[in-house]
C-alpha cells in the first residue's frame, strides 16, 4: 500500500483529501506546515508527498527545496498543490524541485492521474487476479 504524505495547513482541505485517498486504498500521513512536512518525510520516508505551496512559517517551495537537497529524501516525488494558478507557477514549482503540479480546487480524478506516475494505484492492484 503506497504511503502518501499530505502537507496542508487548511484543516478542511487536509481532512477531505486524506479521507478520499484512504478510500482509494492509500496509507495517508498528514503534516500541517513545511517544518513538520520535512520532519515527517525524513522519519516516515513516504512514497509520495503532496505539498501545499502556501504554508505558514516555512512554505512549500522551501520545504521542497530542502527535501530535494537531502540525500535521504531527494528521491521521493513531490506534487505541488496550489490555489495560485498564475502564469509561471508550474515552472516555479518544478524549479523548486517538485515533480508535478496540480491546482486547487483539487479534482480527485486529475490528481490521481498524476499520482500514478509515481506510485501504484491500490485499487488497480486489488483488482488483479493472481497468476
Language model feature labels by segment:
Residues 8, 32:
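Conserved acidic carboxylate
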Residues 15-23:
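Charged docking surfaces used in two-component/phosphorelay signaling
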Residues 52, 82:
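Active-site residues of response regulator receiver
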Residues 56, 74, 86:
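The feature encodes the CheY-like receiver
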Residues 86, 103-104:
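Residues at the ends of beta-strands that form strand-to-helix hinge/output surfaces
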Residues 105-115:
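C-terminal output helix
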